[in-house]
Amino acid sequence: MVKILLLALVFSLAHAQDFAELQGKWYTIVIAADNLEKIEEGGPLRFYFRHIDCYKNCSEMEITFYVITNNQCSKTTVIGYLKGNGTYQTQFEGNNIFQPLYITSDKIFFTNKNMDRAGQETNMIVVAGKGNALTPEENEILVQFAHEKKIPVENILNILATDTCPE
């Protein structure tokens, strides 16, 4: 498992500057959080990716997604602004600091730290893909990231099948 994680890290770092892979159509496959209430069905941070664009050498990352509230899909677009440490900052349901950690041609693993308006912090992992489920190797990487972020494994939710929002 350590070899897989090291390979994932090396691969991710090698591709970290190749932001062309980030752009395009994406779907949320898996979402995980240390505060399960935030990502359960109807939760404010249960979002369904649709599109990512990068501007100004990816110093600005635009993410379009849906949130389902009261059985209604609500389309939202946010712009994350690159900070000096490789993270992006944006506003949605409070302040968010996010970072793409692992990038392939068909998957992106993001971490996100949300500080809501009440001051509650939620650590998250969001995996976006082109529509395919995680491979066993990608699942191992996800579990390791969850351990590092102190997110219980039982809080990892496969939500691809619950995405009923428009393309």
Swiss-Prot record:
The protein's matches in SUPFAM superfamilies, at most eight in alphabetical order, are given as: Lipocalins
Highest taxon in the source lineage: Eukaryota
Q: Where in the cell is it found?
A: Secreted
Q: Output the Gene3D superfamilies linked to this UniProt entry.
A: 2.40.128.20
Residues with glycosylation annotation? 57, 85
Q: Where is the signal peptide?
A: 1-16
Expression by tissue, per the entry, reads:
Expressed in the vagina, uterus, and Bartholin's glands of female hamsters. Secreted in vaginal discharge.
InterPro entries the UniProt entry points to: Calycin, Lipocalin, Lipocalin_CS, Lipocln_cytosolic_FA-bd_dom, OBP-like
- UniProt main location, coarse: secreted
Question: CDD domains recorded for this chain?
Answer: lipocalin_OBP-like
Q: List the disulfide bonds.
A: 54-58, 73-165
List the GO molecular function terms: odorant binding; small molecule binding
**Residues with PTM Pyrrolidone carboxylic acid:** 17
Pfam families referenced in this protein's UniProt entry, alphabetically: Lipocalin
Q: What does the UniProt keyword field contain?
A: Disulfide bond, Glycoprotein, Pyrrolidone carboxylic acid, Secreted, Signal
What does the sequence similarity comment in the record state about its family? Belongs to the calycin superfamily. Lipocalin family.
What is its biological role?
Acts as an aphrodisiac pheromone, reliably eliciting copulatory behavior from male hamster.
Its protein name is: Aphrodisin
Species whose genome carries this gene: Cricetus cricetus (Black-bellied hamster)
